[in-house]
Amino acid sequence: MTSRIKLSGLISPGLYDVHRAVRSGTVDEIVLAGGRGSTKSSCASIELLLLLLQHPDCHAAVLRKVGRTLRTSVYEQIAWAVSALDLSSRFELTVSPMRAVYKPTGQRIMFLGLDDPGKLKSIKVPFGYIGMDWFEELDQFSGPEEVRNVEQSLFRGGSFSFSIKSF
């Protein structure tokens, strides 16, 4: 039996328009700004998971400037979203390597620190392509050129791409 989740209970009313735009497919990037308690990270994690489910050949990369901050921030945020969307039985979350795998398809959400952006050049997935990214704490990155270089390393093919940037 499948349960129905009310997204209105998970996403702040101030972000409903963002969700509607993502759902309609009219945007390929969202930028979420706000302070603590703004629920921007909750929105980002939910949208990333929902998009992953809609694109079975696509994988995702979740990025922070400093790798040691991944586990206590975006990894835990994705774990929360998996649970909130009642998907816990369908995902395997591991910390070494740090990733979330959607068991029915093998799609991966990888968590990457950009302490050394050169490491991204050799990133591979077992099938399909990396088509989604989420830059958390965007203001910690060096600027648009660094973000563009990362996206060029990640988005190397595939028919779909989507970027989430939050700060």
Each predicted region: which residue ranges?
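Phosphate/NTP-binding elements of NTP-utilizing enzymes
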Residues: 1-167
